[in-house]
Amino acid sequence: MEIFIEPIGKLINEFSKLPGVGKKTAQRYAYKIIDMPESEARAFADAILGVKRKVKYCKVCGNFTEEETCAVCRMRDHSLICVVKEPKDVAAIEKLHEFKGVYHVLHGVIDPLSGIGPNDIRIRELLARLQEGNVKEVIVATNPDVSGDATAMYLAKLIKPFDVTVTRLAHGIPIGSEIEYTDDVTLARAFVERNKL
């Protein structure tokens, strides 16, 4: 016999599909939705559907946007590209208000153990941007872990023939950590003290 009636069980099941949300947390979320006024629940549902309908990837950098090209790509210095693993890394860096260039979101890193190779992430698109000839520096801001380092070294090797400076974020970001969770001061210092690859 099921513990929850079908609509509640279904909602709990959907919430538990989110990263970091176990059954207990999913139950709390479901109970909260049940207790919400219908207008708030409808606004919550509309926000979810709005994201799915309106948000797409920038055709230049791969970050989230509602347009063909994101605001960063439309208004920033294209001679400086910061390469990141995923869009949430862009958000973490943008919070600092330090970086004045544009981004390139790989949507992953090279991870042979997970079956992710160079052709599975947006490396070809980065090389196409470099072929335009306007880029002076590429900052590789992948996470300081095995996959992030492997991706950084692979990119440095590919970028070398373009006569573009390739740098990596400096020390201060702990090995094995994720950029998204790095505090603002540490992340800002890592940008200022970035290293050549």
Model-predicted segments: where are they?
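Extended interfacial segments that mediate partner engagement and assembly in macromolecular machines
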Residues: A26, R74-I139
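Long C-terminal interaction/binding lobes of large macromolecular proteins
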Residues: L127-I139, P144-L197
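S-adenosyl-L-methionine-dependent methyltransferase catalytic core, i.e., the SAM/SAH-binding region
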Residues: I8-S16, Q27, I33, F64, ...
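Signal for well-folded cores of large energy- and translation-related assemblies
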Residues: S16, I34, L49, G62, ...
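Cys/His-rich Zn2+-binding cysteine-cluster or related metal-binding knuckle/ribbon modules and their
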Residues: E2-I8, K17, T25-V90
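Core recognition of P-loop NTPase motor domains used across DNA-transaction enzymes
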Residues: S39-G50, K59-V60, A71-V72, A91, ...
